[in-house]
Amino acid sequence: KYKVDRNDTLIAFGGGVIGDIVGFTASITLRGINFIQIPTTLLSQVDSAVGGKTGVNTKEGKNLIGTFYQPKLVISDVSLLKSLPKREILSGYAEIIKYGLIMDKRFLNWLLDNESKLMTFNKKYLIEAVFHSCKNKAIIVRKDEKEKNIRAILNLGHTFGHAIEAINNYQKSLTHGEAVSIGILMALDMSSLKGNSCLLYTSPSPRD
């Protein structure tokens, strides 16, 4: 109908679901055409728009249908976040904190020191948070793009989080970031019970 050819480019302008669907569509159209990500939520800017995971959800579960397919370009403009309710900012903040927990203690301490600035949409600090989140994720993805090994660390909180979303029938009463936040706490609790307690989590001061 639209006479698409391999020289065309799809643009994903929206949050994580839009990015996943457009990316998946690009990956299976004519065996792959270019696409560009322009994420408009904090969560998508720091996580889902980068890394190359695409897919569509089904009633059977999340991520059962999808591909690894990298965008040609990701444009993250934090000015687009101004219209978001605080709840959506907090949802994205969960993914940002994840990077601090799994690989970057200095970044985690910076987040704790500047939480109020991030929550009040300080552009300078939001840019810094988005940049370091994407940088940390890129380090992992370069080593293991298809998630056969170390990339699985980026799923901290997601195993439990996806189960929570499924139990909740993927209703908007619980955002993805909120489910991941709960999932991270559950994962850290399980780790502690198995004798692999996380110092950053169990210590009264994350800097100890």
Identify what each model region corresponds to.
Residues K1-I36:
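N-terminal small/polar loop signature for handling phosphorylated ligands or for N-terminal nucleophile
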Residues G23-S116:
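A glycine/threonine-rich phosphate-anchoring loop and its flanking beta-alpha core
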Residues Y93-I97, L111, A129-K137, I184:
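Short alpha-helical scaffolding segments that buttress acidic/His motifs in well-ordered protein cores
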Residues E95, A166, L185-L193:
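Short glycine/serine- and small hydrophobic-enriched flexible loop segments
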Residues F121-N168:
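Oxyanion-binding "anion nests"
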Residues E178-I182, M186:
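Small-residue-rich helix-loop
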Residues Y201-D208:
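Conserved small/polar residues in nucleotide/adenosyl-binding loops
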